[in-house]
């Protein structure tokens, strides 16, 4: 989206495999190794939650038995995006404050080797996490209706219940500082217990080559994490990790300002969307 929604490095090559047993073994070894690395002496509460639920990052391998080579690759890419995102979010050191809004919304950033500059939005939303998940995942293609930073989101392909490939076109920026961008992304959506995840990274898809007049940008890993507030389960602690390469000759100072402000704007647009949804439900006639 630009914001929300999530995109990451296109043109990444992945080794395809037809051996599902090998895929299961390799994926689980890598995932558990990563989670062990995340476990420092004082792991954050949500990482501890992830470790307790070992099924968080594991795909339902039995659902993949009928997948072809390309579908298996997309599932694997989505899992990798989630794994990398959790690793980044689990490291609390080295973050620099970019924005602190009057309502407490905060954007932080840090520079990572082989990834570049990443941004992290941290907000508290007056919505239950399952409602937010339903809007961002279940109504994903409607995002352009309420987020002016997004012109269109289209699901190109679904693989099982947790993986999809999407095409997103960004909306105009003030003063057209950044021209039209689009993204092709693989997304991994998971709900485990009370915690919801939406991770993604750039990929390629045969039905969506680069479009004339639009710069194909890259993103990833990106991830939204939604979990109930410890103080009030009707509120959600919302974290959004954003990593984007907009391509083109754009000064870094402008990119940093655009991306951090995009995250703050997204939080406000999402609040308004959820408020509008609540009003619509209240006004709906009883059956």
Swiss-Prot record:
**Protein name as annotated:** Steroidogenic acute regulatory protein, mitochondrial
Task: Keywords in alphabetical order, please.
Answer: Lipid transport, Lipid-binding, Mitochondrion, Steroidogenesis, Transit peptide, Transport
Q: Which organism is it from?
A: Salvelinus fontinalis (Brook trout)
Keyword tRNA processing attached:
no
What Pfam families does the record point to?
A: START
Q: What CDD domains does the entry give?
A: START_STARD1-like
Q: Which Gene3D superfamilies match?
A: 3.30.530.20
Which SUPFAM superfamilies is this protein grouped with? Bet v1-like (SSF55961)
Q: What GO terms in the biological process aspect are recorded for it? A: cholesterol metabolic process; intracellular cholesterol transport; regulation of steroid biosynthetic process; steroid biosynthetic process
Keyword Mitochondrion in record = yes
Q: State its role.
A: Plays a key role in steroid hormone synthesis by enhancing the metabolism of cholesterol into pregnenolone. Mediates the transfer of cholesterol from the outer mitochondrial membrane to the inner mitochondrial membrane where it is cleaved to pregnenolone.
Q: What's the chief localization of this chain?
A: mitochondrion
Give the pathway annotation: Steroid metabolism; cholesterol metabolism
């Amino acid at each position: 989206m630009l914001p929300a929604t999530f995109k990451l490095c296109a043109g990444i090559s992945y080794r395809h495999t037809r051996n599902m047993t090998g895929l299961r073994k390799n994926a689980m070894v890598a995932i558990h190794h990563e989670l062990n690395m995340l476990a420092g002496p004082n792991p954050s509460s949500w990482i501890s939650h992830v470790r307790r639920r070992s099924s968080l990052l594991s795909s339902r391998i039995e659902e993949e038995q009928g997948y072809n080579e390309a579908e298996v690759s997309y599932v694997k890419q989505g899992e990798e995006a989630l794994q990398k995102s959790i690793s980044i979010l689990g490291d609390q050191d080295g973050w620099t404050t970019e924005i602190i809004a009057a309502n407490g919304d905060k954007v932080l950033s840090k520079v990572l080797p082989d990834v570049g500059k990443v941004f992290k939005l941290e907000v508290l939303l007056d919505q239950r996490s399952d409602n937010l998940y339903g809007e961002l995942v279940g109504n994903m293609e409607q995002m352009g209706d309420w987020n002016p930073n997004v012109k269109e989101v289209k699901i190109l392909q679904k693989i099982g219940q947790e993986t999809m490939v999407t095409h997103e076109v960004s909306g105009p920026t003030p003063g057209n500082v950044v021209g039209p961008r689009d993204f092709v992304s693989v997304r991994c959506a998971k709900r485990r217990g009370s915690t919801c995840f939406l991770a993604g990274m750039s990929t390629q898809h045969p039905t969506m080559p680069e479009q004339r007049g639009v710069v194909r940008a890259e993103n990833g890993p990106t991830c939204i994490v939604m979990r109930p507030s410890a103080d009030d389960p009707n509120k959600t602690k919302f974290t959004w990790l954003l990593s984007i390469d907009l391509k083109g000759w754009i000064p870094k100072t402008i990119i940093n300002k655009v991306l951090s402000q995009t995250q703050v704007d997204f939080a406000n647009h999402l609040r308004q969307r959820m408020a509008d949804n609540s009003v619509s439900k209240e006004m709906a006639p009883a059956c």
